[in-house]
């Protein structure tokens, strides 16, 4: 009996490990219209003196002290009457997004999606998480990925153009101070352009020499350009050499936010973050763990950080302008962060002008596929293939496409995604009913042979080879194939895996109500009662009904499909009937409702099919 129990436990573990391996094999990881009247750009100048994760303590007066740089050069952010001296915030609103900027660095403090709300809260989804003074969203550093971000105050210019196009620009005079006291001034600028009804915006980054006249200079032994002193600070001889922008082999580095939103729940094991890089029409996934780092030195078309339902994707206008791409997953105090650094090559020209197109929004094909067709987006982009971020990939992708089509079909008939899940499950089970029936017939045949098998085991007890020979002879005489009951299930496995993946990640399920007050969101676990305390060991604070229904349906199905067994098999059958469903109860307790609706519906439909076939078989016997 102990031996049988051990074998049953080992087999159960192998099934779970095998399922996980198969899922990884199949899904490899290397991992409505809006009113134009809402097109408003609101500048909200706010003097800020408090410490915050966004901007830090605002200065009332800008410093002129030179700052040491990893490249060995000294950068100066000079004062002038035209430079801004107070930190202010600016808000851009479109029908789809609400973006808060700071003039410190010209960075983004907050990026909210106005059509999507945070889980169980009436707040917009926040896509900029864990921002801090030394790393905000789209911070710029002069130099490579190790250089500090520019944290000076910028001048601001904002416009609303034709067709509701929003533009907000940030400009700043900077200078490189040389050993002889001379300075090379230049202008650093960032400009964001937002189109209405679009989740993508443009980010223009430029560095340009403020040149007035050209003359020879004996101290430098080269042709230099004289520049206005007001841009470099008082009482300073200003010389700008025409040698471009090179701060330690790089012009600048652009950084995405430390982490994308929405805010992650540590208990949600179904949420994830992953990197993906597109190049040459192909996409590669990078699944970095804590403190992981990956450097990409080849030209890339785009790079992304994505989660279960939302994504941030950056498309550089000139892939060859990038020296490298650095994907980072540093371990922060409470969680692993995920961000990307775009390192721009050094240039020998007196000006740098780059454009990045940034998508921040739903990780869904219906949105991302618009950037494969020029007529469907305002940028004229085509064949970007950024929709690969929303596609699970693997050999089961065609099945997922079919399942999505079925879901949408049933949703048009009955506009409830929970009902659509059940109808798709029923349709799939009906489609595969011939295979289910074949498996049932094989099970019935096994029940008929069970007495003969028991007699063989008793007669040749201790002689394993003889038992195998007699069993094979029995199967031949009865024209029974032991694998005939397994093959129908194996054929259905790809569909089961595809449905599991789809129902766990389908964007349309986010915020979709199935049953009011019980299942208000198919992307979240259900809840029937909130406990005033956390349960010991599990730390559960919510009582859920779907996991209970799933376990009950699984136990009923297991008992109905059991074949007669010997006393020696009793322990292993008990484990398979009761212990495994209980294991899955804990495993799926916090699973999204949509996934459990699918599993429970599949068990229910299969249970009904088994009852019908069993009743039909009993009638035929009589």
Curated annotation (Swiss-Prot):
Interacts with the Sec translocase complex via SecD. Specifically interacts with transmembrane segments of nascent integral membrane proteins during membrane integration. This is Membrane protein insertase YidC. The chain crosses the membrane at residues 6-26, 413-433, 483-503, 513-533, 579-599. Gene3D superfamilies: 2.70.98.90. Its main location: membrane. One of its GO terms (molecular function) is membrane insertase activity. It comes from Treponema pallidum (strain Nichols). Disulfide bonds: none annotated.
């Amino acid at each position: 009996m102990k031996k049988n129990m051990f074998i049953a436990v080992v087999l159960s573990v192998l099934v779970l490990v095998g399922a996980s391996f198969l899922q990884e094999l199949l899904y490899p990881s290397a991992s409505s219209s809006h009113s134009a009247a809402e097109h408003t750009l609101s500048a909200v100048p706010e003097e800020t003196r408090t410490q915050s994760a966004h901007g830090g303590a605002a200065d009332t007066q800008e410093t002129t002290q030179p700052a040491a740089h990893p490249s060995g050069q000294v950068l100066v952010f000079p004062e002038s009457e035209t430079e801004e001296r107070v930190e202010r915030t600016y808000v851009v609103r479109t029908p789809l997004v609400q973006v808060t900027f700071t003039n410190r660095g010209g960075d983004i403090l907050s990026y909210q999606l106005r059509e999507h709300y945070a889980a169980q809260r009436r707040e917009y989804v926040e896509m900029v998480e864990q921002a801090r003074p030394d790393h905000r969203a789209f911070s710029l550093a002069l130099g490579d990925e190790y250089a500090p971000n520019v944290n000076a105050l910028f001048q601001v210019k904002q416009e609303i153009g034709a067709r509701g196009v929003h533009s907000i620009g940030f400009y700043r005079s900077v200078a490189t101070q040389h050993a002889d006291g001379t300075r090379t001034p230049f202008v650093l600028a960032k400009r964001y352009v937002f189109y209405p009804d679009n989740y993508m915006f443009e980010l223009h980054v430029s560095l340009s020499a403020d040149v007035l006249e050209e003359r020879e200079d004996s101290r430098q032994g080269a042709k230099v350009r004289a520049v206005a002193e007001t841009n470099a600070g008082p009482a300073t001889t200003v010389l700008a050499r025409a040698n471009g922008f090179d701060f330690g082999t790089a012009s600048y580095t652009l950084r995405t936010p430390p982490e994308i939103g929405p805010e992650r729940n540590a208990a949600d094991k179904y949420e994830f973050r992953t990197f993906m890089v597109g190049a040459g029409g192909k996409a590669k996934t990078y699944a970095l763990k804590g403190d992981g780092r990956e450097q990409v030195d080849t030209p890339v078309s785009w790079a992304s950080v994505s989660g279960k339902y939302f994504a941030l994707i950056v498309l550089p206008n000139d892939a060859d302008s990038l020296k490298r791409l650095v994907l980072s997953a540093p371990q922060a105090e409470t969680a692993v962060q995920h961000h990307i650094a775009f390192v721009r090559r050094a240039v020998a020209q007196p000006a740098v002008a780059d454009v990045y197109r940034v998508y921040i929004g739903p990780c869904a094909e219906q949105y991302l596929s618009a950037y494969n067709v020029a007529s469907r987006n305002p940028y004229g982009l085509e064949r970007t293939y950024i929709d690969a971020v929303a596609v699970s990939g693997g050999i089961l992708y065609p099945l997922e496409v079919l399942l999505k089509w079925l879901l949408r079909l049933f949703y048009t008939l009955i506009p409830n995604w929970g009902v659509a899940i059940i109808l798709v499950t029923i349709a799939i089970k009906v489609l595969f009913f011939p295979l289910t029936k074949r498996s049932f017939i094989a099970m019935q045949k096994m029940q008929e042979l069970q007495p003969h098998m028991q007699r063989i085991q008793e007669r040749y007890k201790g002689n394993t080879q003889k038992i195998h020979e007699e069993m094979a002879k029995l199967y031949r005489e009865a024209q029974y194939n032991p694998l005939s009951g397994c093959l129908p299930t194996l054929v259905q496995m790809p569909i089961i895996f595809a449905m599991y993946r789809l129902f766990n990640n389908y964007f349309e399920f986010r915020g979709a109500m199935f049953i009011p007050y019980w299942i208000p969101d198919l992307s979240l676990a259900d809840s029937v009662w909130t406990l005033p305390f956390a349960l010991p060991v599990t730390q559960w604070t919510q009582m859920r009904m779907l996991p209970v229904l799933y376990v009950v349906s699984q136990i009923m199905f297991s008992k109905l499909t059991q074949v007669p067994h010997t006393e020696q098999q009793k322990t292993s059958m008990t484990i398979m009937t009761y212990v495994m469903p209980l294991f899955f109860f804990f495993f799926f307790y916090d699973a999204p409702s949509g996934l459990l609706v699918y599993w429970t519906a599949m068990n229910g439909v299969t249970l009904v099919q088994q009852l019908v076939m069993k009743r039909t078989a009993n009638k035929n016997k009589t």
